[in-house]
């Protein structure tokens, strides 16, 4: 699942853990513990994970751990994103949460999906009705599945904003 490699032993271990937990009637969050935005590699991960774990009611899909340095439009709908690292600038296609959710649902999987807000899953003001003039903000549309859980990571070093208050407001 990483850099085009399948890591067979690792995947067997993940399968074993998921099967052991879900066979006991418990839940597992399959968390793509990545951040920034959903790349081609991460899209491929979800494509494969849905084939293996789709419709296992005990598996919850955590789409992207901590999105950051993107706006709500990119978060929801994807697009071309320019980034800079030690090698210079590059532009890459990133996938929006709605695109990945649609891919999962189009494969018939109804698993609950977790979507973190922006700025390391801290903010989710973009999900409020009326945000940016949009009737329902950037909320994800899940017409055929078991729903979306919105995830916030409340960090104490960001006192200027209270996501709990915003959650109640939205």
Region annotations inferred by a language model:
Residues 18-32:
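Substrate-binding cleft of carbohydrate-active enzyme catalytic domains
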Residues 33-37:
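Short glycine/proline-centered loop/turn elements that form peptide/ligand docking sites
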Residues 1-20:
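Active-site-adjacent substrate/metal-binding segments within catalytic domains
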Residues 24-27, 39-60, 64-170:
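Extracellular glycoside hydrolase catalytic/binding regions
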């Amino acid at each position: 699942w990483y850099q085009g490699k399948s890591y067979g032993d690792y995947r067997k271990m993940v399968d074993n853990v998921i099967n052991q937990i879900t066979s006991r009637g418990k839940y597992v969050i399959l968390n793509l513990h990545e951040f920034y935005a959903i790349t081609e590699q991460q899209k491929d991960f979800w494509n494969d994970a849905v084939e293996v774990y789709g419709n296992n009611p005990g598996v919850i899909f955590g789409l992207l751990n901590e999105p950051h340095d993107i706006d709500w439009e990119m978060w929801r709908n994807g697009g071309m994103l320019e980034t800079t690292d030690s090698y210079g600038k590059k532009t890459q296609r990133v996938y929006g949460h709605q695109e990945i959710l649609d891919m999962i649902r189009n494969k018939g999987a109804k698993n609950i999906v977790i979507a973190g807000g922006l700025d390391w899953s801290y903010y989710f003001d973009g999900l409020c009705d009326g945000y940016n003039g949009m009737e329902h903000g950037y909320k994800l549309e899940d017409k055929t599945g078991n729903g979306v859980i919105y995830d916030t990571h409340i960090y104490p070093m960001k006192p200027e904003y209270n996501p709990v208050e915003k959650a109640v407001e939205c």
